[in-house]
Amino acid sequence: MIEAVALARELLRIPSVSRDERAICDFIEERLQGDGELSLARFENNLVARIPGSGPRVLLAGHLDTVPGEDRVFEDGEVLGGLGAVDMKAGVAAMCEVATRDLARDLTLVWYSCEEIDASENGLRRLAGAMPGLLNVDLAVVLEPSGGAVELGCQGTLRAKVELRGRRAHSARPWMGRNAISRAASLVDRVDRLEPRRPILGGVEFKESLSAVRIESFVANNVIPDSARIWCNYRFAPDLSPEEAAARLLDWLQPVLEEGDTVTVEDAVAGAPATMSGFEGLVAAAGSVRAKLGWTDAGFLATHGVPAVNFGPGDPLLAHSPGEVVAKAEIAGCVEALASWLAS
C-alpha cells in the first residue's frame, strides 16, 4: 500500500510546472500499476484509475501541476515544504494512498494537468471530452487544499475590462484636457467600496469580493492620457449566474461611468452550488465545514450536474506562496477521513 506522507515527499522532488507534468504523471502511473485492484487509463499527462464497488459512484480529482517558483524541497520536523506542497501535491499523494485502500465505494480517481493555467488546456476538461462517461458519477471531491475542512461548492468568477475616456492635452496645461488616470482613481475607489454580499447557502456563508487587478494608461511622459483601462475581478456567490453577476457589477460601476466608456466581460464562469447532501459522512469524519472562497474545478463538475466539494490537506492561504508547507498529520488525516467515508 502507498503511504501518502512518504509519497508527498517524493512528489515534491519532481518539478511539474503547468505543461511539464509528464514526469510526475509517469511516476504516479508506475507506482499504481502494481495494485491489481486498479484499472488505469492514460490520456496525455492525465491519469484515470477505476475501482469497482457498490453504492454511489464517487470521483476524486486532483491536479498535478504547480505554478512557477523556486524548486526547493525541505522537511522540518512534522512538516513538508516546497513548491506545490499545499497546492496540491499533498492532496495528490493522499489520493494515491486512498486508491490502494480496501474500500466499498465505486471509485474513480483522476490526476490531471494544467489546472493552474487557461481553462482551454485544463486536463480534467480534456479528459471529459476524450473519455465519454468519465463524469457519470454521483458525487465528487476535489482535493484542493482546505485546511482539513470540507469546503462546499465554490464561488463564480468574472473578469471585466473597464475603459474610461478622457481628453488628451499637454502636461504643462493639464486644464486643457481631462486626465483618464484621475477618472480611473475614482473607479478604483468605487470598486474598493463595494459592500460584499454574505449569503448563507447550504448552511455556510459565502463572502463576495470585487478587486481591481490591473491598470493601463500611457501616451507619453508629457501628455495627459485620454484613456485608461482597468481590469476588475468579481468573485460572486454561487446563487448568481455569470449574467446576473455581470449585471450587478455594471449597476455598481454606473455612477462613475460616462458616455463613451465601455465595460467588457472578458471571462466569466459559474460557481458550484453548496450542498452537503451525500457528503454528510465526509463532513463528520473531517469535523468541520465551510464555504469555498475561490473558484475550483468543483464549478466545472457542477456544469455537468455532479455535486462536488473541496477537501484536501494544507492551508489554502499558503498556496502559490514561497512558504508552502503542509503538516504530515494533515495529510494522514485527509486520507483517514476519505477512507472512512468511502468504506462506509
Where are these regions (language model features)?
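Acidic/His- and Gly-rich active-site-bordering loop/insert found
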Residues: 1-85
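Hydrophobic anchor at the start of a short beta-strand
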Residues: 39-40, 47, 58, 107, ...
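Fold-independent oxyanion-binding glycine-rich loops
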Residues: 43-45, 62-64, 113-114, 139, ...
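Active-site metal-coordination/substrate-binding segment of hydrolases
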Residues: 57-111, 119, 123
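Acidic-glycine-rich active-site phosphate/pyrophosphate-binding loop
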Residues: 64-76, 137, 152-163, 309
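Acidic/histidine-rich catalytic neighborhood of metal-dependent amide-processing enzymes
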Residues: 93-159, 202
